[in-house]
Amino acid sequence: MAKKPYGEVTKDIVHIADVDLDGHKPIYVELRKVVGVNWMFAHAVCAALGIDKWRKIGSLSDEELEKLEDALRNPWKYGIPSWLYNRRRDPETGKDLHLVGNDYKITMEFDIKREMQINSWRGYRHREGLPVRGQRTRSHHRKGRTVGVIKKK
């Protein structure tokens, strides 16, 4: 099966959402390098904008790149369903949000600090450096130096 021609790659490096992306790779693959964008959301953005996900990201025009970045930051404008967002029912506003880049990192950091301040179980597990989501700790999640076995005399 022959590949479809998508025109020349005009840009070697594309800058979207504070991340430098390789212009010679497909949109679908490169969007996942942006913090806060998973493969499902990348697929939804490509479908909402009507762009083929296997098209090289360097072949997009400046207008298309602006639309792509706007769709990452404001997905509700493009009809992307809210169940794909990475921050549903925000505690401060109560709205469904989608955060990308440093906004995502900072917000997650504040959420963990808030959990620790209110002394919730999740906050306690974070504070103690233990697994938060119910994993077992008998054999894994041990930190520090190992103490060897001492032979009986």
UniProtKB/Swiss-Prot annotation:
Note the SS bond partners: none
Is Ion transport there in the keyword field?
no
The terms describing its cellular component in GO are: cytosol; small ribosomal subunit
Q: Which Gene3D superfamilies match?
A: 1.10.8.50, 30s ribosomal protein s13, domain 2
One of the record's GO molecular function terms: structural constituent of ribosome
Keyword annotations of the record: Ribonucleoprotein, Ribosomal protein, RNA-binding, rRNA-binding
What are its GO biological-process terms? translation
Looking up Pfam families in the UniProt record yields:
Ribosomal_S13
The answer, when asked if Magnesium is one of the entry's keywords, is no
Region Disordered: list its residue ranges. Answer: 132-153
Basic residues bias spans: 135-153
Assembly and oligomerization: Part of the 30S ribosomal subunit. Forms a loose heterodimer with protein S19. Forms two bridges to the 50S subunit in the 70S ribosome.
The UniProt entry's sequence similarity note says: Belongs to the universal ribosomal protein uS13 family.
PANTHER family linked: 30S RIBOSOMAL PROTEIN S13/40S RIBOSOMAL PROTEIN S18, SMALL RIBOSOMAL SUBUNIT PROTEIN US13
HAMAP family noted in UniProt: Ribosomal_uS13
Q: What does this protein do?
A: Located at the top of the head of the 30S subunit, it contacts several helices of the 16S rRNA. In the 70S ribosome it contacts the 23S rRNA (bridge B1a) and protein L5 of the 50S subunit (bridge B1b), connecting the 2 subunits; these bridges are implicated in subunit movement.
Protein name according to UniProt: Small ribosomal subunit protein uS13
Q: What is the originating organism of this protein?
A: Nanoarchaeum equitans (strain Kin4-M)
Q: Which gene encodes it?
A: rps13
